[in-house]
């Protein structure tokens, strides 16, 4: 009975632990820390509708700008490194907004490991490793792009793993659904930082290998490789 409820109970427990590790005293430091000086400033440009030059794609900074907008921030703070946040900047909410992406990574890691058909002990080990990894927890607690990058990397991997398990139901509605979600996740991760293209490479190499095996199997009917056309 417990095993049947595990896919529901386990992610709830892991998410609760993630909430603690990512949100506990997240607003204690009221100083602009590390790259908050850059990405907070870029978010301010969006809020003030100003053009600026940046080496990264825009989605991450747009989400930072969204967190500022939801926090009631008007974009006037300069985000100078080491400066104290003024009272009218709700930096705690902005950090918590970013932390939400880091929190989601933990249940995603659990479900991904299950989709890859690992043993229960391995699934829990992977989930706890992601939960307790110090660098993952730390970068999720500041106004940075890394938690978003990790989150969309996890969604790409999970959707791809689920898509892979549906090979026997190729061209079904669910198969197409997870294929589209994989593509959407790839688009999101590539729109946060250029290193997200490694996710494209990962799925691309898998696709090449899968097609190579299918085209090389002469016993496989053509309809199993290409969708039927009227």
Predicted feature residues:
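Short helix- or helix-capping micro-motifs
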Residues: 18, 123-131, 138, 158, ...
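Extracytoplasmic catalytic/substrate-binding loops of multi-pass membrane glycan-assembly enzymes
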Residues: 28-41, 51-66, 74-76, 89-92
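Membrane-interface transmembrane helices that cradle and orient dolichyl/undecaprenyl
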Residues: 114-117, 156-177, 213
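Perimembrane helix-loop-helix junctions
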Residues: 159-168, 186, 199-230
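Short acidic/glycine- and proline-prone juxtamembrane loop motifs at membrane-interface regions
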Residues: 33-34, 135-149
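Transmembrane signal-anchor helices characteristic of membrane glycosylation enzymes that use polyprenol
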Residues: 3-33, 49, 132, 188-189, ...
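Start-transfer (signal-anchor) and selected internal transmembrane alpha helices
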Residues: 1-21, 104, 108-110, 114-115, ...
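Transmembrane-helix motifs of polytopic, lipid-linked glycan transferases
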Residues: 92, 96-117, 155, 159
């Amino acid at each position: 009975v417990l095993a049947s409820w595990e896919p529901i109970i386990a992610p709830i427990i892991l998410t609760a632990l993630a909430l603690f590790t990512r949100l506990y005293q997240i607003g204690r430091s009221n100083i602009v820390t590390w790259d908050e000086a850059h990405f907070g400033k870029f978010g301010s440009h969006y809020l003030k509708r100003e053009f600026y030059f940046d080496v990264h794609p825009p989605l991450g900074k747009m989400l930072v700008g969204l967190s500022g907008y939801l926090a009631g921030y008007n974009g006037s703070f300069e985000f100078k490194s080491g400066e104290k946040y003024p009272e009218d900047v709700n930096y705690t909410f902005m950090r918590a907004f970013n932390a939400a992406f880091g929190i989601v990574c933990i249940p995603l890691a659990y479900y991904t490991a299950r989709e890859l058909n690992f043993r229960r002990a391995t699934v829990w080990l992977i989930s706890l490793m992601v939960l307790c990894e110090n660098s993952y927890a730390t970068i999720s607690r500041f106004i940075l792009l890394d938690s978003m990058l990790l989150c969309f990397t996890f969604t790409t991997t999970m959707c791809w793993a689920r898509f892979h398990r549906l090979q026997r139901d190729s061209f079904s509605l669910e198969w197409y659904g997870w294929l589209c979600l994989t593509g959407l996740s790839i688009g999101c991760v590539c729109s946060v930082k250029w290193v997200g293209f490694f996710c494209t490479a990962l799925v691309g190499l898998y696709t090449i290998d899968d097609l190579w095996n299918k085209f090389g199997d002469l016993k496989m009917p053509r309809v199993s490789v290409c969708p039927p056309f009227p």
